[in-house]
Curated annotation (Swiss-Prot):
Transport among keywords: no
Keyword Iron annotated: yes
Membership in a protein family: Belongs to the aconitase/IPM isomerase family. LeuC type 1 subfamily.
The protein, known as: 3-isopropylmalate dehydratase large subunit
GO terms for biological process, alphabetical: L-leucine biosynthetic process
Enzyme class, first EC level, given as a word: lyase
Pathway(s) of this molecule: Amino-acid biosynthesis; L-leucine biosynthesis; L-leucine from 3-methyl-2-oxobutanoate: step 2/4
Quaternary state and interactors: Heterodimer of LeuC and LeuD.
SUPFAM superfamilies (UniProt xref): Aconitase iron-sulfur domain (SSF53732)
Amino acid sequence: MSKGTLFDKVWDLHTVGTLPSGLTQLFIGLHLVHEVTSPQAFAMLRERGLKVLFPERTVATVDHIVPTENQARPFVDRLAEEMIQALEQNCQENNITFYNIGSGNQGIVHVIAPELGLTQPGMTIACGDSHTSSHGAFGAIAFGIGTSQVRDVLASQTLSLSKLKVRKIEVNGTLNPGVYAKDVILHIIRTLGVKGGVGYAYEYAGTTFEQMNMEERMTVCNMAIEGGARCGYVNPDQVTYDYLQGRDFAPQGADWEKAVAWWESIKSDADAEYDDVIVFNAADIPPTVTWGITPGQGIGVNQLIPQPEELLEEDRFVAEEAYRYMDLYPGQPIKGTKIDVCFIGSCTNGRLSDLQEAAKIAKGRHVAEGVKAFVVPGSERVKKAAEAEGLDKIFEAAGFEWREPGCSMCLAMNPDKLEGRQISASSSNRNFKGRQGSASGRTLLMSPAMVATAAIQGEVADVRELL
């Protein structure tokens, strides 16, 4: 395993064989399931008379469609109720662990798996959700998959995949005050483009990542897919082990010491060979805001929306489309853009540390008149921990709504949606047209602290002015 990257080692250890097509048949150590992409997969198994091969390696929760205001059953939305009932039935029939609403462990799938200790270094992880790359923060190789692949994993615990190249992205130095993990990943995507990572796994490295806690690393890995990479990961270290130790599904006792020794062995070697290496300086990264309709259309909060001629030729068409859709123009400051709705939450930024940073901004201040602002914890555990610290009271005193866990306005498969031409400041991961529920709604991505700042000021503003 000399000169190997973590990706190479984990891939090779989980390779079942090479198929006639040339694809690798890869064993999946953990399969995460939710209510949106699984019903058809379970139905396909039934049609073929198949059972779930390894139910003990499958864990389910409900997150995408759950309302965050009133979670009483049956849901008002009939389709949402049907979807959760289908998941309940499928899990019961197949002996799959299911964390339902009220279990104490329900939440966004990419939040609950790490906090339960299910996500561990060296694993291969799959889920029918684009942002499965989040789990790479632990040194796992994690893929988002489609419904037919969900079926394949349920039936065979394997996926047929092409091996990726590995790009090392180093970020070195200490982030300036008011600059967060969300700014790091938005800056990377802005620089490399939304297609820059196609065909790659991204290894995030450097002193900046060494200084990050696990929740910050999850934020970065969560959005690897937005930069075109199939997955992103950080090598495990003592920060990883400290986070995992004592969690529900983490190894215990003598097994813990064995696990750590093995986790150390699968880290990228010092002389590992990469297909590409790109280096960033943390000091160059500003609080970042997206202005357009892709996560790559980002600028520093004090910068101007770019002129077409400042962009690469292949980016100009999408930029022109973004100017029209967003009703923004080249050379306009993003700072001062009026905001209608502020959303703090999602699998990108719905964890405890995200809420803590936003609460620092909200404390002793109040949401601007005419702005709707709400906070959605990423899980029942996050909600409980935040309430134990009094964060809910801080937010409510500042005029924010405090909600129940769920995906919420990240994708608007639930009642949390923009209306008409509303523009939101959002801590989520996608700003596509119509992403937040209105066909003409507009989304500006930023860190939770920046969202809180926008809520207080009623417009895009620099969080550093409130620190």
